[in-house]
Amino acid sequence: MAKEFLIELGTEELPPTQLRTLAEAFAANFEAELKGAELTHEGVKWYAAPRRLALKVTALAEHQADKIVEKRGPAVSAAFDAEGNATKAAQGWARGCGITVDQAERMITDKGEWLLFKQEVKGQPTADIVVELAAKALAGLPIAKPMRWGNKTTQFIRPVKTLTMLMGSDLIQGEILGVASDRVIRGHRFMGEREFTIESAEQYPAILEERGKVMADYEMRKAIILADAQKAAAAIGGIADLEDDLVEEVTSLVEWPVVLTAKFEEEFLKVPAEALVYTMKGDQKYFPVYTEDKQLLPNFIFVSNIESKEPRYVIEGNEKVVRPRLADAEFFFNTDRKSKLIDRLPMLENAIFQQQLGTIKDKTDRITELAGYIAEQIGADVEKSKRAGLLAKCDLMTSMVFEFTDTQGVMGMHYARHDGEAEEVALALNEQYMPRFAGDDLPSNGVSAAVAMADKLDTIVGIFGIGQAPKGSDPFALRRASLGVLRIIVEYGYNLDLVDLVAKAKSLFAQQDGTSRLTNDNVEQEVIEFMLGRFRAWYQDEGFSVDIIQAVLARRPTKPADFDQRVKAVSHFRELEAAEALAAANKRVGNILAKFDGELAAEIDLALLQEDAEKVLAENVEVMTEALEPAFATGNYQEALSKLADLREPVDAFFDNVMVMADDEALKTNRLTLLNNLRNLFLQIADISLLQK
């Protein structure tokens, strides 16, 4: 027989940003426990609301199946001595099984005959073990900071108030986290029944919705919020900004979602939209509304947790709450514009970037020089890049950014425009932080790209230079910064070398007395290795296999755009028919050369070529070396590898017909030199011997 099983944990308000993660982990953990206990079922569905976590298991077996457990003993040859008496090993094994050696069965395998003990183990009722399984599942939740409550010694993410466990209509007796199982379920704080009893698991979650006015189904609440918010925005001729992270958070904050539309005074639209949106989304969890051409409307959509008979009062209340915050933004904006950005530059002397690396003014000076250097390399306007670098951090000293920290950069852009700075300079103040996350937009022009790379490289080199390279944690977000630099270079195809960039960045940490702020002598090598290491994760995310990435990394190309061309070329080569054989041949050549402790010749001695196969290969290698020079010079690695694939037949013939390690030293050295020349052709692109089948 199988029944529906329900477990609901009633708690105090759970952290909204963690609710989905907790619920999904609870379901995954419990399903794993059921599997380990060999309890059959048809599925586990999770439910989550601000004050509850619940699971419902469909068709859960009421009883574990009986099973035969086999315990193999020693081999018969080792279980008895020459006289046929049981050895100590056999006796000890039998004792552990609770039998005598004579009672053991025999098992014959292809490796011999063994003693065997078979025991029938009766399955336990699910009701007897499910409490322990649920407790283990909860104990495995990803809770960074568990808490205690009352006089209890148990810990959980929030205090637990109720516990309900039902198998069909039967109450499962037990205690988890210090709370005994009961049929009592809590409803909404302000609507429906505060508490009520549930008779069977099948009633959940419908009874909670009907009597308790709580939608326990997380995905249902989210779908309602999305659909109703889109309708509400359309009703006022707009489009709601339904960013998924915010939708998730709001879904986790409400038990009974009611979507409402409110407004604010149009005069606030004179303030940059980003500041208003920051207030609405960050502080109040409201959804901004835009026109089709991305202009902010004087409206916002919010989700109430109650179904009011007078929704206008709820709307007015939210409008009243947001108005002072918008007024603050307006005040800061007007006040900040009374001073130019450049006038705030000296104030950066009072802000520490990092104790050993100096002030933000020091960092600004370095960014200015490095941005100019990079701009020159990529053909961007040098003076505009330097100007943008000089102004890059000035908005950190404004009231707006001090109050609304996430507006850094974008407010700098608006203030720069107000001050009459060139548009490229203004854009760079915002785009210096791009890309902010994986998949984010890149800086839109060369000036912005130069400043963005300069800012990131200064941070990376500086932090590595004082010996604080990221290990587990990454407080300065150096991994993200490194990937940002690489993305900008690769996606714009800039001919930049990390060696040059890192060396230039390092040089700018020199102080007036000739010493450097940096104390790590290996900073250049460590930074380059760190940044190249970011390629591994990036290209794996792009779908390239690890061995392709490793094949390129083995050559340590330090020009990111060049690295990208190599990866794509090797990926294309791997699909060719000749790839597997040539990869194996390169591996074989590498192994042969590694064992040779002599000195290779400077060039092949044609007079020493004896076998037809080695003559053909030598000719092909010579022709290929000359033919591939243009492809190598221009970085056309795909064309080069496609041509190198033609060497498969002469390479195969060489290994089939030529004794490489000949007794004659001159012959051996000449053949090894030929193989080395062959391998070097491939190594100009990647170490294809690392490619897997």
Curated annotation (Swiss-Prot):
Catalyzed chemical reaction(s): tRNA(Gly) + glycine + ATP = glycyl-tRNA(Gly) + AMP + diphosphate
UniProt xrefs under InterPro entries: DALR_anticod-bd (IPR008909), Gly-tRNA-synth_bsu (IPR015944), Gly-tRNA-synth_heterodimer (IPR006194)
Main location (coarse class): cytoplasm
GO molecular function terms listed in the Swiss-Prot or TrEMBL record: arginine-tRNA ligase activity; ATP binding; glycine-tRNA ligase activity
Organism ancestry: Bacteria, Pseudomonadati, Pseudomonadota, Gammaproteobacteria, Vibrionales
Cellular compartment(s): Cytoplasm
Protein name: Glycine--tRNA ligase beta subunit
Entry's EC annotation: 6.1.1.14
GO biological process: arginyl-tRNA aminoacylation; glycyl-tRNA aminoacylation
Family designation: Belongs to the class-II aminoacyl-tRNA synthetase family.
Disulfide cross-links: none
SUPFAM superfamilies, sorted: HD-domain/PDEase-like
Entries under Pfam families matching the protein: DALR_1, tRNA_synt_2f
UniProt gene name: glyS
Keyword annotations of the record: Aminoacyl-tRNA synthetase, ATP-binding, Cytoplasm, Ligase, Nucleotide-binding, Protein biosynthesis
GO cellular component: cytosol
Quaternary structure (record): Tetramer of two alpha and two beta subunits.
